[in-house]
Amino acid sequence: MDILRLIAVAVLGMALGTSCGLNFIHYMHMFQLNSYHADEQFKWIGKNIKDVIMRHVFTIGAILTFIICGETNASTCFIAAAFLFLGIVFSAPKKAKKKLVFTPRVMRMTVTSVILYVLLILLVFLTLGMGYASLAITMCVQILTLVMAMIANLINKPIELMINRHYINDAKRIINGLPDLTVVGLTGSYGKTSTKFYLEKLLGAKYNVLMTPESYNTTMGVVKVVRGQLNATHEIFLCEMGAKNVGEIKEICDIVKPKHGIITSIGPQHLETFKSIDNIIKTKFELADSLPDKDGIIFLNYDNEYIAKHECNKNKVTYSLGGGTDYYADNISVSENGTQFTVHNGNEEKQFTTKLIGSHNVQNIVGAIAVANTLGVPFADLVMPVKRLECVPHRLQIIKGTNKTIIDDAFNSNPTGAKAALDTLAVFDGFKILVSPGMVELGEKEYELNKRFGEQAAEICDFVIAVGERQAVPIVDGLKAKGYPEEKTYVAKNLNEALAKVENIKTGGEKKIVLLENDLPDNY
């Protein structure tokens, strides 16, 4: 092999390796965001087929170069490498909202994938020799990056199950070794994370409390917290429980053994994976089913019709806004500086003040008050903790500036929460701007509910920026249905473009009040 051809082959190999690496990392990132579920990954591929094709079209050009030329001289290798380098430019990593986390599981899948790549390439060259056909077939490994993470995950599945089982058993051992610990489970289609944060502050007036951080609510996320943070000094463990499929709440309950639980809401969130609202109801009430019959208590938000109508034979404490439940709030007064309300329980009542804005927040606070009071914290001792409650980041978080106020509700939007966010926006005086890509994972109702969101926005907003050309369609249709002026509507390709548009909107001297409703992760 002459020197020039050797250099050309080396350049080709470098280009192929770089292209494979960039695309493998990209697809692994999406696989992680899709919870390592192959069916979710294939749905993502279908929704983003144009981007997927563009990531591999230059590789097809490299393959055709060898097929058409029928030889492996230096010029052919350089041309093929040029195609691959063009693909590398297109596949260059973009700034991610949530970066790929190189967990031990990801590293194991990566090692398995590398071994598979090496074996495939060796098999090709040992079978066909160093000809143009071998190089053309070798180029196909770049296209294989599309499914390689899923293949590696399938191969590693027995190992992953064994590792997970070890961690789960260890978490069970820790829980069983803390007989005086009270575990409170929290679940709901929405509101569970905010309620958890509020409850941690309210119970902290009397107890040493540990809660699962941020949105740690999967089985292995909970296991990680139990193994890494829970100890004998903790008196109460607040365990958030999330699910996308039937049985996932029960799986967490079997590990942490909750004594009490709270179901904050039931709605069409994750309807795409649950398939039906009945499956969502069944899954959320797996928490109630797991509680001890004798002294376990399930706290239920009776403002939610699905919860109120569901028959539950456990000891229950109900809460709501308005009345007719064990705990309820009324006399709710909302301003842009906060909210005042009165909470009742039997003959006892107490007025509370919070910096948080809107009845949506009051509902979650009342749920937290119901749990804390039932667990022995008097109303009088809850007044100051409620007053000191801070907004949970990205959940109706108010960020005030000189010329504009941001209402950051960017985390996991849902139909009820989105309406509550618009109601919060309506409280403020100023030029009201909505920035939103709409809501996802709502199954067959996704278009209908996003269109309704657009209709609701038309009643409140002075300007609407819909983010994402595909996601914007139902929102814009909802605005049009209400006769919303077209000149007050803008469709942005991404959040950065939307925020740039916010800066350029003329308000006639009014202060800008900007609602950021939902911020879809990178896999949408």
Regions found by a protein language model. Give the residues of each.
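Short beta-strand segments
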Residues: 185-187, 240, 301, 435-437, ...
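ATP-dependent carboxylate-amine ligase
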Residues: 1-160, 370-380, 384-524
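Proline-aspartate-enriched helix->loop->beta-strand connector
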Residues: 257-259
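Walker A (P-loop) phosphate-binding motif
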Residues: 171-217, 520
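Acidic, Mg2+-coordinating active-site environments of NTP-dependent enzymes
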Residues: 263-405, 430, 451, 455-463, ...
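Switch II (G3) loop of P-loop NTPases
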Residues: 234-249, 406-412
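Membrane-proximal helical linkers
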Residues: 155-178, 195, 222
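Membrane-embedded segments
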Residues: 218-219, 223, 245-251
